[in-house]
């Protein structure tokens, strides 16, 4: 039952499976154990946090209010909450993942609060100035904002999970290579 799925994954150049995949059962093919993905809600689910901590969520200039579709990547309290929630999720897996992806929802939506649209001081010097409020028109700025957030999370998670590799999502606004180094973990 599992072998055909594993063969199909290999034929399509795949080398991983999550813990729920039929290809993972028995792991005859030595796939990487991968988890994560679209995990913004693992970091701060709107059902739990939106009423009590709306500042965790993205501000929309269009509506003039916080919206639960995305997160405010410059909020330091969100960062700490996200890290603690992700630690709990990773510890809850039967097997610790070989690779954990810190990805966003399939959307161009980004927080448009003053802090998220402010110039970005770059590690190593320099400043990245936003050219547009629209991530499609200024992907370098918004990619850098996202990857700096991912770097902060990875820096904290790798202290507790040194054997786990971490990744992010490189599409939508994050497809543009950022103006910062990525954490090599």
Please provide the spans of the model-predicted regions.
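Feature activates predominantly on carbohydrate-active enzymes
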Residues: 1-148, 155-162, 167-170, 185
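Distinct, well-ordered alpha-helical segments
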Residues: 175-184
């Amino acid at each position: 039952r599992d072998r055909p799925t594993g063969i199909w994954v290999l034929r399509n150049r795949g080398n991983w499976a999550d813990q729920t995949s039929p290809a993972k059962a028995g792991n005859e093919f030595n796939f990487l154990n991968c988890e994560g993905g679209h995990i913004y809600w693992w970091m701060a689910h709107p059902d739990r946090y939106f009423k009590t901590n709306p500042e965790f969520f993205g501000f929309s200039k269009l509506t003039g209010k916080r919206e639960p579709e995305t997160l405010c990547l410059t909020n330091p309290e969100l960062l700490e909450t996200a890290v603690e929630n992700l630690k709990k999720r990773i510890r809850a897996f039967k097997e610790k993942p070989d690779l954990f992806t810190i990805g966003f929802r399939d959307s161009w939506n980004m927080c448009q609060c003053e802090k998220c649209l402010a110039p970005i001081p770059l590690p190593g010097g320099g400043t990245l100035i936003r050219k547009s409020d629209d991530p499609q028109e200024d992907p370098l700025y918004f990619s850098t904002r996202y990857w700096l957030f991912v770097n902060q999370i990875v820096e904290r998670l790798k202290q507790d999970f040194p054997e786990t590799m971490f990744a992010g999502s490189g599409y939508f606004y994050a497809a543009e290579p950022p103006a910062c180094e990525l954490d090599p973990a």
